[in-house]
Amino acid sequence: MYKFQKANIQKQSKQYIWLLILGGVTILASLIYLLCLDSVNKKIVTDSIYTYFHNFRKEEYDAFSLFLGSVGSNLLFTIGIWVLGISMIGIPIVFLLYMAKTFLFGFSIFGILQTFGLKGILTALIYVFPFKLLFILGMVVLTFHSLYFAFRLCSNLFRKKSYHLQQYMIRYSKLLGILLILSVIDALWEAYVLPNLLFLF
């Protein structure tokens, strides 16, 4: 029993590492994509980011609209990955959603650095920590369990293996609840706390 649990933990650790590497590669791809943009599109990106943060300093933004946009995006990825995990046919889309989220995460960071230079390091840190980073790590965990659940469903149906998924479904649902709460907290932070923090610098 102990050997089985140890082997299972080692296997899951490798899968988590694989997802982290995939996320890291996707973040690196966002940097390469940004560097490969022509001057016109680079200017569009930098102007958009500059306006976004400049409006915070001038207090020319609608906090509630910003909250709705942020929480809507977070919920789209969270619920999407969770639902696809119980659909079996959604395994490739789970990967695409995970890669899309990590790509946007990296693109935001590198876009800030490109716009503000060295001064952008502090801005990027304030933007990322703590909740956006926690949310991305939560996406790693959710993606792992989504794929795990989907593969177990496939094994039950097509390989005639018996996995007791009811108990796992309870844990999977609890994970969704945690991520939904984190999604809302991240959106609240971005809309109501982040602007005030940036205003101090």
Feature annotation, model-predicted:
Residues L35-T46, I86-I89, F116, L147, ...:
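Transmembrane helix-loop junctions in multipass membrane proteins, especially transporters and channels
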